[in-house]
Amino acid sequence: MAATAAALAVTDELALPLRAVGDLAAAAGVSREEVVVITQCASLGGKLPFDDASVGSVLAVIKKVENLGDLFITEISRVLKAGGMVLIQSSPSDQDPNNSIQRKLLLGGFVDVQASAASSQDSEHSVTIKAKKVSWSMGSSFPLKKATKGLPKIQIDDDSELIDEDSLLTEDDLKKPELPVVGDCEVGATRKACKNCTCGRAEAEEKVEKLNLTSEQINNPQSACGNCGLGDAFRCGTCPYRGLPAFKPGEKIALPGNFLAADL
């Protein structure tokens, strides 16, 4: 059994034209003397006398397509080196042989299967099927490159100017707020209620205005007739204290909480 061969030419006929051998040598890039020729390959029982992956290129000139069975395609793949080329020439007299051969090559694991007219001038071998063995060996492994996902980069424009927050403040914003004086409403008997009064002075003044009385008349009530402090039953029609509760002279009149409420 031959160990290796630059190129191998096989045929199921008794002889192989020299032109076909030359075509294989030219396609394989070797000299004609480096091509090993095997005739009547059908008698080999589908076996080729070569080691595994020991042949660079194979040319098969097959007259009968039935001689190119699946077993023979597998044998060609066995002796071919990884990435090796195979050329198959068949007779055009067979019914659409190229499609059948292409299908067998594809099922046999070959790639880049193409059909073209043969360069040989032999009219009996005018259809050429070209294919290529895969460049990797069965059982070989290689690492897969995992895509690394990086964090998105934030583009920071150093030329951009930052706004000073203090520049957004006005002069009024910078002024110190004036706090209200605690208990200011209670200072002095003649003080008026402030705008946002919460101590009750505003309500008291509203009651006084309704009665048309002065603060002095409320805080220190006096009666010329002596009946004003006894109640409405003893007051005259022009009494300024009419409608107020009874009181003692000189004591502050206590107005009820519902004094301003409307009578139903």
From Swiss-Prot:
Motif (Cx2C motif 2): 236-239
Region (Fe-S binding site A): 185-199
InterPro entries reported in the protein's UniProt record: Anamorsin, CIAPIN1, SAM-dependent_MTases_sf
GO biological process terms on file: iron-sulfur cluster assembly
Keywords, ordered alphabetically: 2Fe-2S, 4Fe-4S, Cytoplasm, Iron, Iron-sulfur, Metal-binding, Mitochondrion
Region (Fe-S binding site B): 225-239
Keyword Cell inner membrane tagged: no
One Pfam family cited in the UniProt record for this chain: CIAPIN1
GO function terms (MF aspect): 2 iron, 2 sulfur cluster binding; 4 iron, 4 sulfur cluster binding; electron transfer activity; metal ion binding
Entry annotated with the keyword Secreted: no
Binding positions for [2Fe-2S] cluster per the UniProt entry: C185, C194, C197, C199
Subcellular location: Cytoplasm; Mitochondrion intermembrane space
Sequence motif: Cx2C motif 1, positions: 225-228
Binding residue positions for [4Fe-4S] cluster: C225, C228, C236, C239
Cofactor names: [2Fe-2S] cluster; [4Fe-4S] cluster
Domain of life: Eukaryota
Subunit details: Monomer.
Protein name: Anamorsin homolog 2
Organism: Oryza sativa subsp. indica
Classification of source organism: Eukaryota, Viridiplantae, Streptophyta, Embryophyta, Tracheophyta
